[in-house]
């Protein structure tokens, strides 16, 4: 190495030390990313200080070029490390400022989770079960797809009865294992037949206690308007024994209405009517202000043919049955005038009963 090259190398080393010091100071003084990027270009850009020094290596002899090149790369790494550290510091400062601005006061009360509630019809369903359960009635369940025999024939409906037509009943393709027609049940009365038959089998050869059961559930008919739906909920009741009378029917149902509507002054009348499965039969009406009466149930003494289909001797056993729409009871209890509101799922409507 010549004396001139030695002097040049010493000067370059001094320049490198100064570049490191200047870069560290410049980066530390940068208060935002834009300023930091400008300072980066001053030292590491295409025309930056370190880049210019690298260009000058070509004037040195091979041995000196190798030594100084390594030194310049070392300095470059120091400058890049200072740049990275400052970038991280700025990012941390920005995050801390954002967190401070968006800080959550953990002492504030939380937002309550919205709670659901029972559908008004289900409230009625449970209330009916509770009232009848308190006077010794069981609750029975059964299939919604029934046979033509169980839904109609067992209940003394003649073959030419209008209810059997496709205009009133949803029939299902296919038949059961006994080749009987299948349909969506039009009432929950088939559950009464099933329950009674099981009751008779259970107490075969023994003293049989009275049959007291209610049968709530979904039913289906070809009908749809403001007061009718193709699917609706119904509850039917049955009480059969050796000395059950029509007076018992009047007493049980009147007591039920008073408890359901929580009124002791309810006026009820039993109006003669016709149903294939009861004889005598009656519509049950309830008084609603201004001398108006509203039908709320059908009822009557169980027909002897139905008792036979249940496996009971009509000469020994007698009983009564009734059936009420749960939607109708719900509408009367809450003053609702359109049945379709129950099926629309409007949360604004349902919240009124939460």
Curated annotation (Swiss-Prot):
Its cofactor is Mg(2+). Mg(2+) binds at residue 279. The keyword ATP-binding applies. The keyword Ligase applies. Disulfide bonds: none annotated. Binds 2 magnesium ions per tetramer. One of its GO terms (molecular function) is ATP binding. One of its GO terms (biological process) is phenylalanyl-tRNA aminoacylation. It is found in: Cytoplasm. Its EC number is 6.1.1.20. PANTHER family: PHENYLALANINE--TRNA LIGASE, MITOCHONDRIAL, PHENYLALANYL-TRNA SYNTHETASE. Tetramer of two alpha and two beta subunits. This is Phenylalanine--tRNA ligase alpha subunit. It comes from Cupriavidus pinatubonensis (strain JMP 134 / LMG 1197) (Cupriavidus necator (strain JMP 134)). The lineage of its organism: Bacteria, Pseudomonadati, Pseudomonadota, Betaproteobacteria, Burkholderiales.
């Amino acid at each position: 190495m010549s004396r001139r090259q030695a002097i040049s190398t010493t000067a370059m080393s001094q320049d490198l030390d100064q570049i490191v010091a200047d870069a560290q100071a410049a980066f530390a003084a940068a208060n935002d990313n834009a300023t930091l990027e400008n300072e980066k270009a001053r030292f590491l850009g295409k025309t930056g200080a370190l880049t210019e020094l690298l260009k000058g290596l070509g004037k040195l002899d091979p041995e000196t070029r190798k030594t100084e090149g390594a030194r310049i790369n070392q300095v470059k790494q120091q400058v890049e490390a200072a740049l990275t550290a400052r970038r991280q510091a700025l990012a941390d400062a920005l995050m801390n400022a954002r967190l401070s601005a968006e800080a959550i006061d953990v002492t504030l009360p939380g937002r309550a989770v919205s709670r659901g509630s029972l559908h008004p019809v289900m409230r009625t369903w449970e209330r009916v079960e509770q009232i009848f359960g308190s006077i010794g009635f069981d609750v029975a369940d059964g299939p919604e797809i029934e046979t033509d025999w169980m839904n109609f024939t067992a209940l003394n409906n003649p073959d030419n009865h209008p209810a059997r037509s496709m205009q009133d009943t949803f029939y299902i393709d296919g038949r059961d294992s006994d080749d009987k027609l299948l349909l969506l049940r039009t009432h929950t009365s088939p559950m009464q037949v099933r329950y009674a038959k099981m009751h008779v089998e259970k107490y075969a050869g023994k003293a049989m206690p009275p049959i007291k059961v209610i049968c709530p559930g979904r039913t289906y008919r070809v009908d749809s308007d403001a007061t009718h739906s193709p699917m609706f909920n119904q509850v039917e009741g049955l009480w059969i024994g050796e000395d059950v009378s029509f007076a018992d029917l009047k007493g049980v149902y009147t007591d039920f209405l008073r408890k359901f509507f929580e009124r002791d002054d309810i006026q009820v009348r039993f109006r003669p009517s016709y149903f294939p499965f009861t004889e005598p039969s009656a519509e049950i009406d309830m008084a609603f202000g201004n001398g108006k009466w509203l039908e709320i149930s059908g009822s009557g003494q169980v027909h002897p043919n139905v008792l036979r289909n249940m496996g009971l001797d009509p000469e020994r056993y007698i009983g009564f049955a009734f059936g009420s729409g749960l939607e109708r009871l719900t509408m009367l209890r809450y003053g609702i005038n359109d049945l379709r509101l129950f099926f629309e799922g409007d949360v604004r409507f349902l919240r009124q009963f939460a």
